[in-house]
Design a protein with these regions (language model features):
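Residues at secondary-structure transition points
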Residues: 30-38, 69, 73, 77, ...
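Phosphate-handling active-site elements
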Residues: 48-55, 84-94, 206
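Acyltransferase
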Residues: 180-236
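DPxDG-like acidic metal-binding loop motif
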Residues: 62-90, 95
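N-terminal beta-alpha supersecondary unit
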Residues: 1-64, 188
């Protein structure tokens, strides 16, 4: 089994190749260059360095959201184009699931938090000590609502994601549970985690075609919200 994984849901751009249960290579950047400029060159480079043949791929894994609307569209379009050209399926991997999987083996709750602006986060709650168990499905909620939920669960929590620097002060002031912030090598999206989960899903037959794949946004875009607000104002 050989899978190419693409992660473009945030500022991070990451690609990886997994052969059976080995990550052959991973290329990750966390830098302000648009994914339209980075993803395909990164794929070309990783394929070249690994002396890989794209025709040997069994599937394309895509980090499918939530996250940056532009990034998700670029990741999806890139993956769909490759899958269609190679006539292979796509494995859709929820971004929050893959982020939680970074901390596989953690004894406690894992809580990815992606900054969704307006004091909201894209988040979910997981247990990953052995398998990946979903305690709270991925959603877009206020940081206040998330911390209240975690206070109710009253378990140790590991936070992961770009929401940490945004909401660290709020968490420290309002959390009534023990918590940690993930270290640098775990605290952002990684295509290696997308690939690893994709291998599990692929083995279970959880695939879709290029035509069927759509990102999960979890909420409308800012442009759509602003348009709705303008229309609402006109109606009043």
């Amino acid at each position: 089994m050989k899978i190419l994984a693409i992660e473009a849901s945030s500022l991070v751009a990451s690609v990886a190749i997994m052969t059976d249960d080995i990550i052959t290579a991973e290329y990750t950047m966390n830098h302000k260059i648009t994914h339209s400029q980075t993803i395909m060159p990164m794929i070309d480079e990783i394929v070249k360095r690994c002396e890989a043949d794209l025709k040997e791929l069994d599937a394309i894994a895509i980090s499918g959201g939530p996250g940056s609307f532009t990034g998700l569209r670029i990741g999806s379009a890139t993956g769909k184009g490759l899958a269609q050209a190679l006539n292979i399926p796509i494995v859709h991997v929820p971004t929050l699931d893959a982020m939680a999987f970074n901390a596989y083996g953690y004894n406690g709750l894992v809580c990815p938090i992606m900054d969704a602006r307006r004091m909201q986060v894209y988040t979910g709650i997981y247990k990953v000590s052995k398998d990946i168990d979903i305690v709270q499905e991925g959603c877009a909620i206020s940081i206040e609502e998330l911390i209240n939920k975690l206070n109710e669960l009253s378990d140790k929590v590991l936070f992961i994601g770009d929401g940490i620097p945004v909401f660290e002060e709020y968490i420290r002031e309002n959390a009534k549970f023990d918590f940690d912030f993930a270290p640098a090598h775990l605290n952002r999206q990684r295509a290696a985690s997308v690939a690893t989960l994709a291998g599990i899903y692929f083995s279970n037959g959880e695939v879709c075609s290029a035509k069927e794949h759509l990102p999960e946004y979890l909420r409308t875009s800012q442009a759509e919200r602003e348009r709705a607000e303008r229309l609402s104002g006109k109606q009043e």
